[in-house]
Amino acid sequence: MVRAADTETLAPSQREALKTVLGNRVVVITGGPGVGKTTLVNSILMILRAKGVKCLLCAPTGRAAKRLTETTGLEAKTIHRLLEIDPATGRFSRNESNTLACGLLVVDETSMVDVPLMHSLVRALPNRTGLVLVGDVDQLPSVGPGTVLGDLIESGVVPVVRLTEVFRQAADSHIITNAHRIRRGQMPDMRGADPSSDFHFVERDDPEKIVATLVKLVQERIPERFRLDPIRDVQVLCPMNRGSLGVRELNTALQKVSNPTRPDQPAVERFGWRFQIGDKVIQTENDYDKDVFNGDVGIVERVDSVEQQVAVRFDERLVKYDFGELDEISLAYAITIHKSQGSEFPAVVIPLATQHYMLLQRNLIYTGITRGKRLLVLIGQKKALGIAVRNDRPQRRYSGLLNSLRNDTRKTLA
């Protein structure tokens, strides 16, 4: 059952947005954290379901789909599952000849959807089905080709609802208010941070000191002060994979303190990683046979040297990997900000240094900061943070989508 959303309690900006959505077949809803995207989507679903409209919900990743299920109370699927992918061929069963049976399709985290996947999704929609695309255009674009959400907005061919009002409860969060400052190109407010604040900057200039401070924060200070599990609840997000502050080096350092090697503990070394019971791991590619997807995070539950298998617990599911399949997972004490898209974590820690210079961009830092729910800690150099906040010139992608939208979409959506 959809979560209750009384339209009488909507803010004026949300009520105007609701009229726009209900009056158009295709609509984009965009906005940052705390601006009421979830409330608006729930209102749309409540009204249309009350009228007997069948609504389907989807998102590009498993974790994003799970979050959508939690916030709406309705089942949400990954786009691949919704389109009924055939694991053997990689093709979708749902297409223009076998369309989805729904009157409305809601797509969350649309900024993560690339051009080919969006093309497949639109092909599977019946002609009269409504489409609501929800996302934050200021986040990182998809890993795959194109900038679907940004191009749709820039094209001007579909109505765009821009939610900008940060509501009172969200405005109490320094994570949210500072995320919006960064989105506007302003440095976050770090003056005399209250110890009880949910946003902190710990200044360290030397990379070795950044690592030492980060490890102590993750392993001791954050779990003690905020009563969080250092493995399950605290996530380190890195701008890059390589270097002393990259994913690989930090995973090695964090594994040593979070889940140290024990002689009596079975373990396996494959593809540059050592896996043992209790390790936090991430799926690095879609595996439709196993029903696990790129970005899913789990905990190693069993290492069986006889069967040559590792079992990983992803939420309620136990997934088994042959030793030869362990290139599908890697340690996840630290992951890239790109890999974190579509996910939220109770506590997020982000190292920042000028050695990340080529990747220090506003949308990268903004995306990382908005992953934290209860606590966000930046560790490193203020200069690096300043570079990122000022750098609003991400590499332009030329997929041809924008021109196609401008030329063709008016006729297609008429």
Question: Model segments located where?
Answer:
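Conserved RecA-like ASCE P-loop NTPase motor core of nucleic-acid helicases/translocases
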Residues: 27-69, 134, 199-206, 218-243, ...
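C-terminal accessory regions
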Residues: 184, 282, 294-414
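Conserved helicase motor core of P-loop NTPases
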Residues: 137-290, 301
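Conserved helicase motor core of SF1/SF2 NTP-dependent helicases
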Residues: 23, 43, 47-53, 59-71, ...
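Conserved adenine-nucleotide phosphate-binding loops and their immediately adjacent elements
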Residues: 1-6
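N-terminal pre-P-loop "Q-motif" helix
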Residues: 8-23
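Structural motif
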Residues: 28, 58, 104-108, 237, ...
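Residue-level recognition of short, solvent-exposed, well-ordered loop/turn junctions
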Residues: 126, 276-277, 293, 340
